[in-house]
Amino acid sequence: MNIPPLNDAPSLQVAAGVATITLQRPALRNSLNNQDLSTLLDQFEAINANPDIRVVVLRAHTQDMPHPVFSAGYHVAGLDGDTSAPNFFQTVPDALTRLRPITICALNGSVYGGATDVVLACDLVLAQQGMAWRMPACAIGLHYYASGLQRYVQKMGLSLSQRAFLTGLSMPFEQLQAGGLFHALVSESQFEDHLHQLVQQVLGLAPGAVQATKQSLLDVAEGMPDIAAIQAREASSQSSADFAEGRLAMQERRKPVFQGR
């Protein structure tokens, strides 16, 4: 399943259980307009409807950019005359957070504004050294939306979130990695190899167990977990064919072959 992009809107390509979404507007620092947001929501819906997709990689076209930018966030022209635009923007990271497959952000450039929340909405983030992170909401007079603030505090902690929002200053990725934000922080030359290894690592896990565990972790992080639902997921995994295969593979000292059952 490939969904062709409209002009320079985000593209979606699917191969071997991996869906790759690419932001591809480098001339405007991969900023996102309303059409892009609608495209992303449609792509998320298509991904959730395809049970063969087990990993989603979100990346950006940064080649030939003198200073690589993953995304500059919401295209500010879209705010003119539409004060509700941030409410529409938040639907993208909110939906991304709850995607069924495991999501990996291939953060191969600096990131700004609302795009930082898109990054935080991913389950795992592989980042490139030498880049920067900036949240200028208060610098343009905007109070950020609640779910975005929640993701910031959950993923970055209160102290770094305060530094990001209450100063509006740029923070180097190296500073954020000191707090454990990224799965790994690697050089440009190593980036693609590390990304491939991470994707393969996730693909090697039992799909039912890892997707159910993702949902349970999110439920717990939001502070009001449905214990009965989590226990039901646990019980389902214990009776699954994949759990039986995992135990057998461990006994036979081989890699398991999971079927998602």
Predicted regions and their residues:
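A generic structural signal for short coil/turn motifs at secondary-structure boundaries
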Residues: R29-L32, L79-D82, A221-E222, Q259-G260
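Amphipathic alpha-helical segments at domain termini/boundaries
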Residues: M1-T20, Q24, L169-L203, Q211-E222, ...
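A structural preference for short, pocket-lining loop segments at secondary-structure junctions
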Residues: A16, I21-Q24, S38-D80, L96-C105, ...
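Acidic-histidine catalytic/liganding microenvironments
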Residues: N50, L99-R100, S240, R253-K255
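A short acidic, glycine-rich active-site loop
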Residues: A77-Q90
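Charged catalytic carboxylate motif
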Residues: Q35, T39, F88, A95, ...
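Crotonase-fold acyl-CoA enzyme core
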Residues: D94-P207, E245-L248
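Helix-loop "lid/cap" segments that line or gate small-molecule binding pockets
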Residues: A164, S216-V220, R233-Q238
